[in-house]
């Protein structure tokens, strides 16, 4: 493990008197404005032209521009939030979305323009760096970082500390892999705005995803905590946990066809593509992520060759349907899946139906006549599985049992020839059982061709055949492309002509694995050479170097714009991609290498100088395995008569056993709307700490979130908020327990005076399977006078039994007894009030590294008994 050395701490600032401390709570010491030459000529309003201009000025790659434009459309569609504080005062048409105050980033303070240098000198930042109080400094003035520096020893250890623009330029692969994976553009209106003016495509609900324990479900029904397949760094399929699902709105979509699979996706949704790279006289293949609209027909796209067989036995709930039928027959029902049972269910899907001769009778019929090779096999399986006697009729046999019909319906086997579907749980079965079901379907309504090299199945239900296609893909078989429609006509005795339509699906591959029981319908095996070559080469192209046992590549057959549809996207822990319909789809910059501890904070300062300015900083932190980093940000702005907007997005990935502490000292002037989205993904044994101080702004809406995705992950939020006259601090936290034995702690303190308003808004969610999780929430509010207000909006969602949860909330006023007691000890009333306030916020104030937030030392006094004055 590598650690950076400690440095000498700064001299303690001069202590304030108690009266100065209480007075300073209502003062703002950073409201001066410097000359604003750049801001005076900046363009107002938001449009596609503005977004394109921002991207062009930053010389960004095309994919980033498209991500911005997509986010702009999301922003325009999403309504303003009506919960929380009143945001009607934001005039998006009057905001300046990009102001460039200097043409290049300075490497030393002396290189900064004089007016900007004077601003940061007054904030004390140059002195902070000279005294080595911070490991690295970044200073953002208006829209861009104007100064950046990192300690040489940290740089030598591989620590990356860059502004987001430089991170995009110098580390495009890492940046593209992680940006927008924790907070997608469609998360909320202001995350979309941030992405647009500083992302991720979407799929339609027709995209079906294999979810562990649930089977094949629509992407619209996938939930956080679900486990789905994705491609790992070795180009093999493995399960990953879903962090979030986002309904991304109605968008134009393409229908793409590849390897007998179809998928609808937006043009900017990324897929894994095999492309050739010229290296001198040699050509090699490499896998890259590319948006669908940039992929040409004929290019090889990653597809699943087979889904890993990670399923087990499914136990059916004990049936209470031991109803005796008219023949005094008592049926019993299987308690778990088996090869025989699945073959029989497949046979029923193809050649079965239910009937109701009268209201007290139900019949389950199998249209397998006595001459059919599987007639006797089917009767034997029914008898062994259910203890049922059958009645043989001309067209097959029947079981007269209402209980049998009800049991089938409970498992999802119901409907007629045009409405039957495969239930989702079938896709959670072992391959052997799935292949047995396909075998039953072939025995009922299928046949073989080319001496067993091809199997065909025909049904009246196109949807059922699409279900079978997905099942075959998961088992490693190769369905062909579009279903073939077949129409037949027949003339009845009365002269009527009846027309019927059916659909045919052809399947190839190792068909000897399919569990057919009709001798003439058995498939033949594929040679090892043939099996290895499937999806590793196409029409003279050989990309075997990229293919693995579970992932291959096939040419994109076509893509067609099919109109606008509702779309969705999901994020998957660690993999950042997922398999849908058998196709692989995707979804300030700090990187700390494995084992490196940055014990001295990295620090960023954000300053708005221009009136009506919109500042949209983007922070991305990746703490690799076993590392530690502390990041501190401070914010100030001038006081103007009209409002400005600060809308930030902070994404943090905390790898196994790493730890991140993120401290914010927000001291915006009272004409700034501070609307921030902050979220961390925390993996096995890792820890995320949010230390949040909100002193300024007109309105703050900020709820730092921790998604604990690995076992023994920890999340903590410690926050303090102060609201004075004309201020509303709507703050809180979100904790999502997505793995077992995770723990979270929320401590929130707020003080309101002079008619100010504070609100705590929090969520603790413990998902199913997150057993052994623990959470504690404590939010306390202090009202200094009778005209201020405090509200608490806690939400707790527990979906697991073995959980420890504690919640406590208080709202109190400074009592006359407290003041009387302190004043009886010789303190004046104002001094007594200051002491009460300091004592109230002390548990959080002592965690704030105020020696690094020099611009706030006259508002939060830590040196006086470790408390806020």
From Swiss-Prot:
Keyword Cell division (UniProt): no
Pfam families xref list: Intein_splicing, LAGLIDADG_3, SUFBD_core
Entries under Gene3D superfamilies matching the protein: Hedgehog/Intein (Hint) domain, Homing endonucleases
Single Gene Ontology MF annotation: endonuclease activity
UniProt-listed InterPro entries: Fe-S_cluster_assembly_SufBD, Hint_dom_C, Hint_dom_N, Hint_dom_sf, Homing_endonucl, INTEIN, Intein_C, Intein_endonuc_central
SUPFAM superfamilies: Hedgehog/intein (Hint) domain, Homing endonucleases, Stabilizer of iron transporter SufD
GO BP of this protein: intein-mediated protein splicing; iron-sulfur cluster assembly
Post-translational modification: This protein undergoes a protein self splicing that involves a post-translational excision of the intervening region (intein) followed by peptide ligation.
Keyword hit for Transmembrane: no
Domain (DOD-type homing endonuclease) ranges: 344-477
Domain of life: Bacteria
Database matches in CDD domains: Hint
Keywords of this entry: Autocatalytic cleavage, Protein splicing
Family: Belongs to the iron-sulfur cluster assembly SufBD family.
Protein name, entry field: Iron-sulfur cluster assembly SufBD family protein ML0593
Native source organism of the sequence: Mycobacterium leprae (strain TN)
């Amino acid at each position: 493990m590598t650690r950076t050395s400690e440095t000498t701490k700064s001299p303690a600032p001069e202590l304030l008197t108690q009266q100065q401390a209480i007075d300073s709570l209502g003062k703002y010491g950073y409201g001066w404005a410097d000359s604003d030459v750049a801001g005076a000529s900046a363009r107002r309003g938001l449009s596609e032209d503005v977004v394109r201009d921002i991207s062009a000025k930053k010389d960004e790659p095309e994919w980033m521009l498209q991500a911005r434009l997509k986010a702009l459309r999301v922003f325009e569609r999403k309504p303003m939030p009506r919960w929380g504080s009143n945001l009607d005062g934001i005039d998006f048409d009057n905001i300046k979305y990009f102001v460039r105050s200097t043409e290049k980033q300075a490497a030393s303070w002396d290189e900064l323009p004089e007016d900007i240098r004077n601003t940061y000198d007054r904030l004390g930042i140059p002195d902070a760096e000279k005294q080595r109080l911070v490991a690295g400094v970044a200073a953002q003035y208006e829209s861009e970082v104007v100064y950046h520096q990192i300690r040489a020893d940290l740089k030598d250890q591989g620590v990356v500390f860059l502004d987001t623009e430089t991170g995009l330029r110098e580390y495009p692969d890492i940046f593209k892999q992680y940006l927008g994976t924790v907070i997608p553009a469609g998360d909320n209106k202001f995350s979309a705005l941030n992405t647009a003016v500083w992302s991720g495509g979407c799929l339609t609900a027709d995209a079906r995803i294999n979810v562990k324990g649930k089977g094949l479900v629509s992407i619209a029904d996938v939930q956080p905590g679900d486990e789905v397949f994705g491609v790992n760094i070795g180009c093999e399929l493995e399960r990953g946990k879903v962090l979030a699902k986002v309904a991304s709105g109605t968008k134009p979509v393409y229908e793409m066809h590849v390897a007998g699979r179809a998928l609808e996706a937006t043009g900017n949704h990324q897929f894994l593509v095999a492309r050739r790279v010229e290296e001198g006289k040699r050509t090699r293949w490499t896998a890259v992520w590319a948006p669908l609209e940039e992929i040409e027909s004929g290019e090889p796209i990653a597809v699943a060759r087979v889904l890993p067989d990670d399923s087990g036995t499914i136990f059916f709930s004990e049936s209470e349907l031991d109803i005796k039928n008219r023949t005094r027959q008592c049926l019993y029902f299987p308690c778990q899946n088996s090869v025989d049972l699945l073959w029989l269910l497949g046979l029923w899907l193809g050649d079965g139906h239910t009937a109701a001769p009268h209201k007290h009778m139900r019949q389950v019929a199998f249209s397998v006549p006595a001459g059919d090779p599987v007639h006797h096999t089917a009767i034997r399986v029914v008898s062994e599985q259910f203890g049922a006697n059958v009645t043989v009729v001309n067209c097959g046999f029947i079981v007269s049992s209402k209980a049998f019909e009800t049991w089938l319906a409970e498992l999802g086997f119901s409907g007629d020839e045009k409405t039957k579907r495969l239930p989702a749980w079938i896709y959670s079965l072992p391959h052997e059982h799935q292949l047995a079901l396909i075998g039953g379907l072939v025995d009922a309504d299928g046949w073989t061709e080319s001496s067993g090299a091809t199997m065909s199945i025909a049904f009246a239900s196109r949807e059922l055949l699409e279900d079978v296609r997905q099942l075959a893909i998961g088992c490693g078989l190769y369905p062909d492309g579009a279903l073939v429609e077949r129409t037949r006509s027949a003339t009845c005795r009365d002269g009527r002509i009846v027309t019927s339509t059916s659909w045919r699906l052809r399947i190839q591959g190792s068909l000897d694995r399919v569990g057919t029981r009709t001798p003439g319908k058995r498939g033949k095996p594929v040679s090892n050479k043939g099996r290895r070559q499937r999806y590793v080469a196409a029409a003279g192209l050989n990309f075997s170097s990229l293919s693995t046992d579970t992932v291959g590549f096939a040419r994109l057959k076509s893509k067609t714009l099919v109109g606008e549809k509702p779309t969705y996207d999901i994020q998957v822990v660690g993999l950042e991609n997922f398999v849908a319909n058998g196709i692989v789809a995707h979804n300030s910059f700090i990187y700390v290498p494995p084992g490196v501890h940055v014990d001295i904070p990295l620090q960023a300062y954000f300053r708005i100088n221009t009136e009506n300015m919109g500042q949209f900083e983007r922070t991305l932190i990746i703490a690799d395995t076993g590392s530690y980093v502390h990041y501190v940000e401070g914010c100030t702005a001038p006081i103007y008569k009209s409002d400005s907007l600060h809308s930030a997005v902070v994404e943090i990935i905390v790898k196994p056993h790493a730890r991140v502490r993120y401290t914010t000292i927000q001291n915006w002037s009272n004409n700034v709307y501070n609307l921030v989205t902050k979220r961390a993904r925390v993996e096995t044994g890792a820890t995320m700490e949010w230390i949040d101080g909100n002193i300024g702004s007109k309105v703050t809406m900020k709820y730092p979130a921790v998604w604990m995705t690995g076992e023994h992950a920890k999340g903590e939020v410690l926050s303090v908020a102060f609201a004075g006259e004309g201020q509303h601090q709507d703050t809180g936290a979100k904790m999502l327990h997505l793995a077992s034995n995770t723990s979270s702690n929320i401590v929130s303190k707020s003080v309101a005076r002079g008619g100010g308003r504070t609100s705590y808004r929090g969520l603790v969610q413990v998902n199913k399977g997150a057993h052994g999780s623990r959470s504690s929430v404590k939010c306390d509010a202090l009202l200094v006078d009778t005209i201020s207000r405090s509200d608490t909006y806690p939400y707790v969602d527990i979906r697991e039994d073995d959980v420890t949860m504690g919640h406590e909330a208080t709202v109190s006023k400074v009592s006359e007894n407290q003041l009387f007691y302190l004043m009886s000890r010789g303190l004046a009333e104002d001094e007594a009030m200051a002491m009460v306030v300091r004592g109230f916020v002390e548990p959080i104030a002592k965690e704030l590294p105020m020696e690094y937030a020099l611009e706030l030392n006259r508002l939060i006094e830590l040196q006086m008994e470790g408390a806020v004055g």
